[in-house]
């Protein structure tokens, strides 16, 4: 093998293709792409394979060669491969005549679409092993093209033309001819059904055509079904791929069962297993009949390893045409299946999920009592059977969490009975019955009626003992009772009067005092409503008594005779910094100014007297008239030597008469 060549490994079409078939977007895109590319080259899935036994008809050979030449020119194939392929086809035809081995071994339906798997060799039978595997997969290092015996048509022809060509082909040879006509694209869900026609010479021709879905008439002989194994397998594959547009008749079902009984069960095992799983994904325009479901269940019963996917997917897929009766029948079937599994003690990997999914998936006709009874019976049967299943009964668990508008007291009774049966049974389930736990958390519309009344009655009985020793609280509550008006005061007032042993009080009373008559007794103090009284009894009365006792004990203030000093232990720096502020500076300035004022007054006080002023003017030589007339006062206070020195000096040294006072004042200090 060359280094650049890799073996052709086809994709596992059985596991992946049904998911692609379900995608409506891919189908729409492939349909649009096939319509756009209709004038261009054909796609691999647009091939119509027609195999001839004797390769008769030169016109067909020429047409096949021309179409193959265009196909090779577009897809990069070499004409050398054609000769090899034709030679291989002739050898295969000589090795196993009469069974179309070339179509079965090299170009069966999955391989024609490019979706074959490695396991397809087993389903072809002994006749499908005529060509070696290397020759099937590689021709000169490349995938083998279609042989010359296969007619390639680029565009689909009319049904009438196809029938005429098929008649011409069958008239030329004496062997069986198998023809396949595929839709424009393998993605579209075009109804294709098998149809068999019996010619005059007794030869059977099998054609796969797209039909609109009426009934099928099959007149195939037993010899034809035994000799041709691949058409039946291909038919079963095509049956799994198609989407039915109408109902199948009972004759078709009987013919299918007869063919499947004659054929080998080995190669058809996977196709039978795939059919119910694929049918559940389909959305037919009309509902599937009950006979088909029974037939599928019988086929699935033959192989225990295949899980019950029809019941699993039917709960998730919503079909608008299903009625309440069909839903009830399906649920009855599911409950019977669960009962059979519980009695047989079969530990299946996939348990029946109808009970689990029915609680989550909503259907239009679900809220009925029959379904609830069915669920309760299923849970009871599971509790009675001693089976340790991995999936416990979840209907009681989910019904407590999920709120449904039609929940009534009957559902609660059913849940309680189911939990009691589960408690009595010896089932080791991982999840205990949580209905009792969840019922306390989940709110339901009719819950707060009887339970609250019972709880309030218990509180009232327990609080009657607390109300006895405190009459003041009774009077206060009664006072508030008359002041507050409630719409239901009549019934509450009557109950309160019976409890307190007093007559019913009128809603409105007027006191009229007449002179000389005895005044009426005082009115009864008003009472609180019963709900408030219960709350006061349960919560407020014990706390109030404790508070009152504490207040009575700690009301009087006492001072001790011993005085104790507790020095404040602080740091010196932070304490001084806390005491500093602007007021300290103001105090310092105030004291400094007062000290300066006192000093100046002591020094300048004697010089400001009138006698000192007169002497000063006399010394200057021109005393004023006011000062001359005023006699000099006697010196009462002794003078300091500092003050007396300049005066004595001034008197001892007379000043010259011609000196101006300005110069005299400027040159002396005194």
Curated annotation (Swiss-Prot):
Region ranges (Required for localization in the endoplasmic reticulum): 1-60
Modified residues (Phosphotyrosine): 403, 443, 513
Sequence segments annotated as region (Interaction with SMAD7): 355-511
Reported modifications of this chain: Phosphorylated on tyrosine by LYN; which impairs its antiproliferative activity. Polyubiquitinated. Exhibits a rapid proteasomal degradation with a half-life under 1 hour, ubiquitination depends on endoplasmic reticulum association.
Disulfide topology: none
Entry GO terms, CC: endoplasmic reticulum; endoplasmic reticulum membrane; mitochondrial outer membrane; protein phosphatase type 1 complex
Biological processes, Gene Ontology terms: apoptotic process; regulation of translation; response to endoplasmic reticulum stress
Intramembrane segments: 22-39
Biased composition (Acidic residues): 191-202, 289-299, 321-344, 367-385, 407-425, 448-461
Residue segments, region Interaction with SMARCB1: 537-584
Region listing for Disordered, in residue ranges: 76-144, 159-178, 191-501, 622-670
All ranges on the Cytoplasmic side of the membrane: 1-21, 40-670
Biased composition (Basic and acidic residues): 78-87, 254-265, 489-501
Any GO molecular function: protein phosphatase regulator activity
4 X 34 AA approximate repeats: annotated segments: 355-511
InterPro entries cross-referenced by the UniProt entry: PPP1R15, Prot_Pase1_reg-su15A/B_C
Keywords, sorted A to Z: Apoptosis, Endoplasmic reticulum, Membrane, Mitochondrion, Mitochondrion outer membrane, Phosphoprotein, Repeat, Stress response, Translation regulation, Ubl conjugation
Pfam families reported for this sequence: PP1c_bdg
Top-level lineage group: Eukaryota
Topological type in the membrane: Peripheral membrane protein
Residue ranges with Polar residues bias: 271-288, 302-312, 388-397, 623-645
Extent of the Sequence repeats: 355-381, 396-426, 436-462, 478-511
PANTHER family: GH11727P (PTHR16489), PROTEIN PHOSPHATASE 1 REGULATORY SUBUNIT 15A (PTHR16489:SF14)
Function: Recruits the serine/threonine-protein phosphatase PPP1CA to prevents excessive phosphorylation of the translation initiation factor eIF-2A/EIF2S1, thereby reversing the shut-off of protein synthesis initiated by stress-inducible kinases and facilitating recovery of cells from stress. Down-regulates the TGF-beta signaling pathway by promoting dephosphorylation of TGFB1 by PP1. May promote apoptosis by inducing TP53 phosphorylation on 'Ser-15'. Plays an essential role in autophagy by tuning translation during starvation, thus enabling lysosomal biogenesis and a sustained autophagic flux.
Family the entry assigns: Belongs to the PPP1R15 family.
Protein name as annotated: Protein phosphatase 1 regulatory subunit 15A
Species of origin: Bos taurus (Bovine)
Organism ancestry: Eukaryota, Metazoa, Chordata, Craniata, Vertebrata
